[in-house]
Regions:
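N-terminal Sec/SRP start-transfer signal
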Residues: 1-35, 471-492, 541-589, 878, ...
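Membrane transport/envelope proteins' first extracytoplasmic loop
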Residues: 1-353, 363, 417-425, 429-432, ...
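Interfacial "coupling" helices/loops that link adjacent transmembrane helices in transporter permeases
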Residues: 17, 355-397, 463, 468-480, ...
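Selective detector of the "anchor" transmembrane alpha-helix that sits immediately C-terminal
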Residues: 341-363, 444-448, 855-876, 959-964
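Small-residue-rich transmembrane alpha-helices
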Residues: 358-361, 370, 394-426, 436-465, ...
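C-terminal transmembrane helical bundles of large multi-pass transporters
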Residues: 582, 804-806, 829-922, 926-931, ...
Length: 991
């Protein structure tokens, strides 16, 4: 009964403070939504990764099958029986295997089966014209028209069209199979075109088999048997869509075979040839939408078990999808890693959300301190008080789960649609399902949020009416973490780890390097700045009261600033009252400044890297036509080779690229292997690269990839040095210094291309550190030497043109495949194309990158909203708590205007100091930790170097939000102040 009474009391207390209860519920709901969204996002992102990985692994399959490059291969398990001419099956044995697959394999594939396709084929038969058909062929009747297998495949009629004729007997709508009728088959259009066979023709099928028969009880001998079958071709068929995933055997292969019905095979063919089937395939297309992080391990284990069971049934029966199983294993591993990474990436969000919950819970407790003290004085135990708050937390946690889980669909879609910081894909990725682990994490987050609400209640539960009065009299006590020096203890390991990261580029714990090669998969690099910010923020909050005290001392003797002095003195004397709000401001501004700057730096570095590699929007790798085409040995009629004639290439005029729709301008960029000669005219054996360019157009096209920090001077000026003279040469600055070169000096490069070997003399015009195409990630930056020269002069000195790339500026809406096709139609031989925009988009869609940027975006939005809301609530409630002080000040003679300045001073000073401290720490973290993201990364290119970019515009958004909240709070406080009288303030303050 007592517990029921306490529960009802807890519910009434929640109802009486609806605003604070709603804020608590909001914080817990956000925590639940984020926790539940992480597995849903991971499942959605990794499903896309799986599709892409399967597509990459089956690219060879697509090429071999002749399917279109954009064909989607579904998640399919294929079991096959391959007799290879030795272990041929009879028709009854095929039925036995088919029953085994239907009863034992298909129902146990873990995922729903969308489509099943079964295929059976015999060894090839020689096909000859028969009866009257041979008269149409001027060939010796002993020469076969071709070779083809007898086969059948399920669901064929839904995927073919009949050019002529009717379906063979046994198919739906065709005559029934009879024991004495003709054997009827149909052939593909390709076979008909090749051989001239038409519907209605009679053909003869011949095959010879060697079988071993018993001579007596001890010996056997080989006997050759010949089989002959007469068959009528009743139809010519063609596939409706050659790129349909239905075709488990290439349509081009099936068109060369003879297709008949299973009934014809069983009733007629099997009576002539007992053992004939050499190939059978069972293809099970699975519902990949049902594949989740939870069940992928079961799918892999079940596939392995079924493969073993199939082998036990027949040694020739195997599961062919080894690459599929490998892809699923990678999917499982990466999904588990990504869940952990996303949890760690979202840790700052959880920290701020829990801080918000603790802050609001503390406000709730402070509003109820008087009631709690009275309850304790009237006999309630600390356990009763704790139970009331636990009941409140449990109820809020339950409601948060009910609201937060549906909201997690939106949060997961937000994460999945992020392509960079605060930018989303124009076609959002909607997450429509939650894996079971989402519910478990949602419950865990709700429990954690409920536990956070109990933290402020622990001390209040021990306080009686006397302790409450003493506590209200002065709030100068230091928080527990300050008394325990937690901030300093946390800052020491952070400082040591930071020193390691800055010095060695990696983190070493107990002699073990814990850093990862890919920073996107290295949460330590992301958590270290957050931990450092936490320690620095806690440490800074120690000195904020002293700062307020110092400022109060400075203005204490200035009479007009008396309200400001009083405000600063109150802030200096009662740090415990605003410690939570101050830390929330510091953490939010610090994390926002660091996170936004990290996101902008990573995003711009990706763009810089790709444009450094490509040189422009599009780079076409082209070759010319040699004057010495390859000659095949043994083929008569070829002209004799003239070994004395030099080889050269014939190119289409490059101006033709401007005729391609989408190309705005172009420039030639030839990558020519060279060897440099040093000051003693001795050849340097290091492999080097010369980039011969059309200077003027190249400078315009590559402007986006030319950063001024790529050399000691702006890169635009460096490139323009090539215009000073035709033989001008730009030299890598490292090589320039090591070899004692001088501007204006002559320098010789030995052309290494076999088509134009020989020295070319240049004049050194300037030096650079990094240059597009040659000094990007495609080149060996650590050991190679790179040079840049004018293409016209280089080709002239060589006496010919060498293969060059075309670097182009393109229309953003242009289709790259269409441009390549147009170039080929104009006669350009394009062997490859690199599109910068497509590459950027592909990299932005990496799950790890999406997860990081999605977490940064979601964290920025949620933390800003919660911090602004929490600060506004704190400010309004603190004003009510200061009502007695305001009444006393009014009674002592402060005017309404001076009291207003006092209120504005308290709120404004706290907001300004918290925001400035947080921003300062965020900026410092950006310049300390952002460059370390590039230290050991393989997927973050070492060239170009990181250029830390501060996202001041994003930080300004938080300042605007805080300013708006501060304005609202001040307006509300002043409105309340105007209606407040001294005796009412004292009465209110005593409540």
């Amino acid at each position: 009964m007592r517990l029921i009474s306490l529960t009802l009391l807890a519910l009434r207390r929640l109802a009486n403070q609806r605003a604070l209860t709603a804020c608590l519920l909001l914080g817990m709901t956000v925590a639940v939504a984020i926790a539940s969204a992480i597995p849903a996002f991971v499942s959605s992102a990794q499903n896309r990764v799986l599709r892409r990985e399967l597509a990459d692994r089956t690219a060879g399959q697509i090429r071999l099958s002749g399917l279109a490059a954009n064909t989607r291969l579904p998640l399919t398990f294929k079991f096959s029986y391959l007799g290879l001419g030795r272990a041929l099956l009879s028709y009854d044995e095929t039925l036995d295997l088919d029953a085994f697959m239907t009863e034992r394999i298909a129902p146990r594939l873990e995922l729903p089966v969308v489509r099943t396709v079964r295929y059976a084929s015999t060894d090839p038969w020689a096909i000859l014209p028969a009866n009257e058909t041979w008269r149409r062929y001027p060939l010796d009747d002993s020469q076969p028209l071709g070779y083809g297998s007898l086969d059948f495949i399920t669901d064929l009629l839904g995927h073919i069209d009949l050019d002529t004729g009717r379906l063979p007997a046994g198919f739906p709508g065709a005559p029934e199979v009879t024991d004495d009728g003709e054997i009827e088959v149909m052939v593909g259009r390709a076979f008909s075109t090749k051989t001239g066979i038409q519907a209605g023709d009679m053909i003869s099928l011949t095959r010879k088999d060697t079988v071993r028969v018993a001579v007596d009880l001890k010996t056997t001998r080989e006997v050759q048997r010949e089989y002959n079958i007469l068959a009528r071709v009743t139809a010519i068929w063609a596939p409706k869509n050659r790129n349909d995933a239905y075709w488990i055997i290439r349509p081009e292969v099936l068109e060369q075979d003879l297709t008949l019905s299973p009934e014809m095979m069983s009733r007629r063919i099997s009576k002539i040839v007992e053992r004939q089937f050499s190939l059978m395939i069972w293809s099970y297309e699975l519902d990949d939408k049902a594949l989740t992080v939870e069940n992928v391990a079961g799918v892999v284990d079940r596939a392995n078990a079924l493969s073993v069971e199939a082998f036990e049934k027949n040694e020739q029966l195997t599961l062919n999808q080894f690459e599929m199983i490998s892809a699923l294993r990678n999917y499982l591993k990466r999904s588990q890693e990504l869940i952990l990474l996303m949890t760690l990436f979202c840790a700052p969000i959880f920290a701020v959300v829990l801080s918000f919950v603790v802050l609001v819970a503390g406000m709730v407790v402070r509003q109820q301190e008087g009631e709690l003290a009275i309850l304790r004085s009237r006999g309630a135990s600390p356990l009763d008080i704790f139970y009331m708050y636990a009941a409140q937390g449990a109820l809020l946690a339950l409601i948060a789960v009910l609201i937060g889980v549906p909201l997690s669909f939106g949060v997961a879609s937000l994460l999945a649609s992020a392509i960079t910081f605060l930018q989303f894909s124009p076609q959002p990725e909607w997450v429509t399902s939650l894996p079971p682990v989402s519910l478990r994490l949602a419950v865990a987050a709700a429990i954690l949020g409920a536990a956070a609400t109990l933290v402020p209640a622990l001390s209040a539960a021990r306080r009686t009416i006397l302790g409450f009065g003493a506590e209200r009299a002065r709030s100068a006590g230091r928080p527990l973490w300050q008394r325990a020096w937690l901030d300093v203890l946390l800052l020491i390991p952070c400082a040591y780890a930071t020193w390691q990261l800055r010095q060695a580029g990696s983190l070493v714990v107990f002699g073990t390097d814990v850093s990862q090669a890919d920073p996107f998969k290295d949460p330590i690099r992301y958590l270290l700045p957050i931990l450092t910010l936490t320690a620095a923020g806690l440490l800074a909050s120690r000195f904020v009261p002293r700062l307020f005290g110092l400022l109060a001392a400075l203005v204490s003797r200035i009479q007009p600033l008396t309200p400001i002095f009083l405000a600063l003195r109150d802030l200096a004397r009662s740090p415990k009252d605003y410690a939570g709000a101050l830390l929330l401001l510091i953490f939010t501004l610090g994390i926002a400044a660091y996170g936004a700057s990290l996101a902008r730096t990573l995003d711009q570095h990706l763009i810089d890297t790709i444009y450094l590699d490509n040189g422009g929007d599009l780079r076409l790798i082209e070759v010319g036509i040699s004057n010495k085409p390859d000659r095949q040995p043994g083929i008569p009629g070829q002209a004799a080779a003239d070994d004395t004639e030099p080889e050269y290439l014939i190119f289409e005029p490059p101006e033709g690229h401007l005729e391609i729709e989408g190309i705005k301008r172009y420039a030639r960029a030839a990558r020519i292997p060279v060897r440099a000669r040093n000051a003693g005219n001795r050849r340097n054996e290091d492999k080097s690269m010369l980039l011969a360019i059309d200077r003027e157009e190249f400078a315009r096209i590559a402007a986006r990839g030319l950063r001024d920090d790529y050399s000691y001077a702006p890169m635009g000026e460096i490139v323009n040095r090539l215009a000073t003279r035709p033989d001008a040469l730009l030299v890598e600055r490292r090589f320039f210094a090591e070899n004692g070169l001088t501007i204006g000096g002559k320098f010789v490069l030995d052309i290494g291309d076999f088509r134009a070997a020989g020295p070319v003399t240049y004049t050194v015009a300037d030096a650079f550190d990094v240059f597009p195409i040659v000094a990007g990630s495609e080149a060996d930056y650590e050991t190679g030497n790179f040079f840049v020269a004018n293409a016209a002069y280089t080709f002239e000195r060589m006496g010919k043109e060498l293969p060059y790339d075309i670097v182009a500026e393109t229309d953003p809406a242009a289709n790259v495949e269409k441009m390549v096709q147009d170039a080929q139609e104009l006669g350009f031989i394009v062997i490859n194309a690199y599109d910068s925009r497509s590459k950027i988009l592909s990299e932005q869609q990496r799950p790890e990158r999406q997860g990081l940027f999605g977490a940064l975006t979601a964290g920025f939005l949620f933390m800003t909203a919660l911090t602004v809301l929490g600060f506004a609530i704190y400010a309004l409630l603190s004003f009510r708590r200061r009502a007695i002080e305001l009444g006393v000040l009014r009674a002592l003679g402060l005017s309404e205007g001076q009291t207003s300045i006092y209120v504005i001073g308290i709120q404004g000073a706290l907001t300004l100091v918290g925001a400035l401290v947080g921003t300062t720490l965020g900026v410092a973290l950006s310049y300390i930790y952002v460059p370390a993201m590039q230290a050991t990364g393989k997927l973050i290119a070492p060239v170009p170097p990181f250029l830390t970019r501060m996202a001041w515009d994003n930080v300004a958004l938080i300042y605007f939000a805080l300013a708006a909240a501060l304005g609202f709070v001040i307006a509300a406080s002043l409105g309340f102040l105007r209606r407040l009288r001294a005796f009412e303030a004292i009465k209110l303050g005593a409540v």
